[in-house]
């Protein structure tokens, strides 16, 4: 499968035995905050922080200027087109639970940590992901260090969350929807070859 990790593969540390924690805030980078990343950096486990700032130039500039002050190695990226690949190579995703991000994380089998979801769709997605064991909802940034350390030092729990995320994922959703629509088109209305 192109997008998913594969049903049999556990969450593996990135190169050199290091886990990778992906922090995203949507295409505009509004969910990724400097304070969130600063709190994440206080976690005691060994990992690389991969931040996608989207089009949020201010956050990108802040992070680049303060990069040397962080304990954990950090990659800072602006707008990216390879989100699915980044998720597949991440042990954990900290981000907003919008529809597209949640769907991509589930297909990739990447567990989520969700902080301060917005009312409406994000809260509904959060409740569903937490109920199925694919995500953890945190109310405050300051809870990040303990939760991230606990997850990354407990591979069994992290693998279980990844498996539950994969079980929710629908890698063929677009094709399935197209086939369902085509199945309801009467033969006489179908275009001629």
PLM regions: where:
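Nucleotide-activated sugar donor-binding and catalytic core shared by glycosyltransferases
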Residues: 1-53, 58-193
């Amino acid at each position: 499968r192109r997008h998913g990790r594969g049903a049999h593969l556990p969450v593996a540390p990135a190169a050199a035995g290091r886990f990778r924690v992906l922090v995203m805030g949507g295409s505009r980078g509004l969910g990724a905050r400097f304070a969130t990343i600063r709190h994440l950096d206080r976690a005691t486990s060994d990992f690389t922080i991969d931040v996608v700032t989207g089009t949020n130039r201010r956050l990108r500039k802040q992070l680049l200027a303060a990069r040397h002050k962080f304990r954990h190695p950090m990659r800072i990226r602006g707008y990216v087109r390879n989100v699915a690949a980044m998720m597949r190579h991440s042990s954990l995703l900290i981000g907003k639970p919008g529809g597209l991000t949640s769907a991509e994380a589930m297909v990739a089998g990447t567990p989520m940590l969700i902080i301060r979801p917005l009312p409406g769709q994000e809260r509904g997605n959060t409740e569903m992901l937490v109920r199925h064991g694919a995500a953890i909802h945190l109310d405050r940034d300051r809870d990040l260090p303990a939760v991230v350390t606990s997850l990354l030092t407990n591979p069994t729990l992290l693998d279980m969350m990844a498996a539950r995320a994969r079980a929710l994922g629908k890698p063929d959703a677009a094709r399935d929807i197209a086939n369902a629509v085509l199945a309801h088109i009467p033969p006489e209305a179908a275009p001629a070859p």
